[in-house]
């Protein structure tokens, strides 16, 4: 699933007030009646519908006793993200109907507006939509209106760019901990004690590198990638010399 469908900054100029909404315990709070109604609209096979319903309502053990479940989807199952997206597709459609700029990745989403007044209005209306239509509780303590420089999203951050006569422009960057995570993975693969053939080591590096770059491809990463590439080349040379 893509984080951004277009680069925030290309056509996003002036969107400086972010509505950050935290869905409280999303997977545990999914309302079965709302979800099943949406599934019934899409799936016509009675057997499939019956299996989904049984899977959703399978009893869970609490304090040694089995209890029926009327809300929530089991985390860790491959079905859970699919069913959750069926529910949150209604949110996507509502935001698109309002012609709002937004980013959603699973239950993590934010809406971008041009003023605090608009942000407050949009935030209140979406709070009502989530509660009334989807029956999803909102964590008000973790929700609010943010400025780009104070906001993080899935390893990304925004830093202001300063140009004479231009205000409200931000550059999309990658957070330090995301860079550190990539470097740790590369370091593990290039340890000389790892019993990899050289071709195997290169393949593993390529998988990690390309996966990370694809995830953060819309951020400003070229300069740091060049520096990281030089560091990686030196480690690979050391692996060859140590053979």
Question: Can you describe what each PLM-predicted range is?
Answer:
Residues 43-47, 78, 195-204, 223:
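Structural motif
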Residues 204, 217-243:
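Conserved nucleotidyltransferase catalytic core and NTase-mimicking acidic/glycine-rich helix/loop elements
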Residues 2-150:
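Conserved polymerase palm-domain catalytic core
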């Amino acid at each position: 699933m893509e984080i951004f469908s277009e680069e925030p900054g290309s056509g996003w100029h002036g969107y400086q007030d972010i509505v950050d909404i935290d869905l409280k315990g999303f997977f545990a709070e999914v309302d079965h009646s709302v979800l099943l109604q949406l599934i019934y609209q899409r799936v016509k096979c009675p057997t499939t519908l019956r299996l989904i319903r049984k899977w959703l309502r399978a009893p869970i053990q609490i304090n040694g006793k089995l209890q029926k479940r009327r809300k929530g989807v089991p985390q860790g199952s491959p079905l859970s993200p699919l069913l959750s997206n069926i529910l949150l597709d209604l949110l996507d459609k509502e935001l698109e109907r309002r012609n709002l700029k937004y980013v959603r990745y699973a239950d993590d989403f934010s809406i971008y507006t041009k003023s605090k007044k608009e942000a407050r209005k949009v935030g209140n209306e979406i709070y009502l939509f989530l509660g009334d239509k989807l029956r999803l509780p909102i964590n008000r303590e973790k929700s609010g209106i943010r400025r780009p420089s104070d906001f993080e999203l899935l390893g990304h951050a925004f830093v202001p760019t300063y140009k004479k006569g231009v205000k409200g422009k931000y550059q999309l960057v990658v957070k330090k901990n995301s860079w550190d995570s990539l470097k740790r993975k590369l370091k593990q693969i290039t340890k000389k004690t790892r019993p990899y053939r050289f071709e195997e080591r290169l393949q593993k590096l390529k998988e990690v590198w390309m996966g990370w770059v694809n995830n953060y491809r819309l951020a400003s990463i070229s300069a740091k990638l060049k520096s990281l590439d030089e560091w990686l080349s030196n480690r690979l040379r050391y692996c060859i010399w140590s053979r």
